């Protein structure tokens, strides 16, 4: 069986979108997916990088085009339940800690699915945002 390592941050809308497509790939191709939660903000900091919305802030139409591409992806894969979390960007540290516990207890994949749906579909999880100074 083929395996895929999927590194993701719950706080990223792309994680939700990719997760939904990965579920279809798993079903259709019988691929095993190893979900690996990461803190994307920590990776940005460690690599002296910035999130796209900051990095390309001054580049005319870059963020608008990125949003257009996201919308095209959503339409192509019929991911119509996706909703942009109004508190984006959110802090995902506690969620990732929960993922570690879920993995130890043997239900990581279910945990990931539920959290991503609640962050980017039902909008039941609206953690503190880095913008409001709470953690």
Predicted regions span which residues?
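Local sequence-structure signature of Cys/Sec-based thiol-disulfide redox active-site neighborhoods
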Residues: 2-17
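Proline-centered helix-kink/hinge sites
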Residues: 13, 37, 128-130
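Single conserved hydrophobic/aromatic residue that forms the stacking wall/gate
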Residues: 125-135
